[in-house]
Amino acid sequence: MAKEIILTQEGIEELKHELKHLLEVVRPQVIEELVEARNQGDLSENADYDAARNRQAEVEARIKELETMISKAKLIEDSSTTDGAIKIGSKVKFIMLNTKQTREVKIVGAVEADPFKGLISNESPIAKAILGKKVGESVEVKDINAPYSIEIKEVN
């Protein structure tokens, strides 16, 4: 059986929006580009036609990928817990004990992860270390370079 793809509601909506855009805007544009390139004549040495075919293949592959991800998506429900434990979907504020730097992240599935936006994968070393933990707990993160400790300050 294929692996589930863990997504928040926002993540599913983003994928659906991208899919709709590809189906309703990009795909028709690519088809028009193909028609225009085909009308230029000899297809054997037609760079525009080759480029349009390549673009069509890329778009169709992305459409298929999005459809597969959406069909295999496992929705993360409301992240609030009665016991305060961190789970996928939780927003967590922590302090790195070695640098005293404070960070705030949201734990999401791997497909949605974007560290620059503070969205970390549930498969990341930090998420693996803090999942199931609570405010006030300190944990060691087993990083590739060197392990470090963090203290959980806030969970939303």
UniProtKB/Swiss-Prot annotation:
Matching PANTHER family: TRANSCRIPTION ELONGATION FACTOR GREA (PTHR30437:SF4)
GO molecular function: DNA binding; RNA polymerase binding
Family statement drawn from the similarity comment of this UniProt entry: Belongs to the GreA/GreB family.
Gene Ontology BP, a term: DNA-templated transcription elongation
Coiled coil stretches, renumbered: 2-78
HAMAP family per the UniProt record, alphabetical: GreA_GreB (MF_00105)
Transmembrane parts of this sequence: none
UniProt entry tagged with the keyword Transcription: yes
Organism: Mesoplasma florum (strain ATCC 33453 / NBRC 100688 / NCTC 11704 / L1)
Protein name from the UniProt record: Transcription elongation factor GreA
Pfam annotation, one family: GreA_GreB
Keyword tRNA-binding recorded: no
Its biological purpose: Necessary for efficient RNA polymerase transcription elongation past template-encoded arresting sites. The arresting sites in DNA have the property of trapping a certain fraction of elongating RNA polymerases that pass through, resulting in locked ternary complexes. Cleavage of the nascent transcript by cleavage factors such as GreA or GreB allows the resumption of elongation from the new 3'terminus. GreA releases sequences of 2 to 3 nucleotides.
Keywords, comma-separated and alphabetical: Coiled coil, DNA-binding, Transcription, Transcription regulation
PROSITE patterns on file: GREAB_1, GREAB_2
